[in-house]
């Protein structure tokens, strides 16, 4: 619908490696960064968890005896692979009132009237400020056009999203949507979505 979106890959700290003080600092950074975005901005964070099997790297020449034993020990063990992405989108006041089943393709004008060059410049400046604030605690890396739409050799994020895989080479498969399940190829999809502030706690804190 002609909205502007900037995509990032987020590198989060390992599980159980963050102290209470560091967690509070990260939470404060998120709150501070979100406040610099203009009105009618959408912050969309995605966490992808894919079931995979560990593939050892036994072909490396510099592995010690313990390293090789470690690789063999975890060979083909199942685990959840995690990827995190962040999307910052600039919408308009009119767009914010629209329902999810509305499409501007049914209208004579696709680009919103409020969207202009000055608004785009201000939004991109706020995105850069957002990025600087978050990078003090969490690593953000802006995705390029090729990483989003792909190239002739490598799949982009959109193709991976539509095929439920993180592989560099993807194959688009049939998508089955019904009232009870969502399936892409032979893979089942499970979504946990939060879009209403009433579903969130009033306060976020750590246990001291």
Give residue ranges: language-model regions.
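Extended, folded cores of ATP/NTP-driven motor/assembly subunits in large transport
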Residues: 1-208
């Amino acid at each position: 619908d002609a909205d502007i979106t900037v995509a990032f890959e987020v590198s989060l700290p390992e599980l159980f490696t963050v102290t209470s003080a560091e967690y509070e600092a990260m939470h404060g950074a998120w709150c501070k960064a979100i406040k610099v975005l203009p009105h009618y901005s959408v912050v969309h964070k995605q966490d992808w968890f894919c079931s995979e099997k560990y593939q050892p790297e036994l072909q490396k020449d510099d592995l010690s005896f313990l390293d090789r034993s470690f690789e063999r020990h975890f060979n083909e063990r199942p685990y959840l692979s995690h990827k995190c992405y962040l999307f910052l989108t600039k919408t308009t006041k009119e767009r914010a009132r629209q329902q999810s089943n509305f499409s501007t393709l049914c209208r004579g004008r696709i680009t919103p009237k409020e969207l202009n060059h000055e608004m785009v410049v201000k939004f991109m400046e706020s995105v850069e400020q957002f990025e600087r604030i978050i990078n003090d605690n969490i690593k953000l890396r802006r995705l390029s056009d090729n990483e989003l739409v792909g190239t002739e050799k490598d799949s982009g994020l959109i193709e991976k999203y539509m095929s439920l895989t993180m592989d560099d080479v993807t194959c688009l498969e049939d998508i089955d949507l019904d009232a009870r399940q969502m399936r892409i190829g032979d893979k089942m999809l499970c979504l946990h979505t939060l879009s209403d502030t009433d579903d969130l706690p009033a306060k976020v804190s750590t246990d001291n």
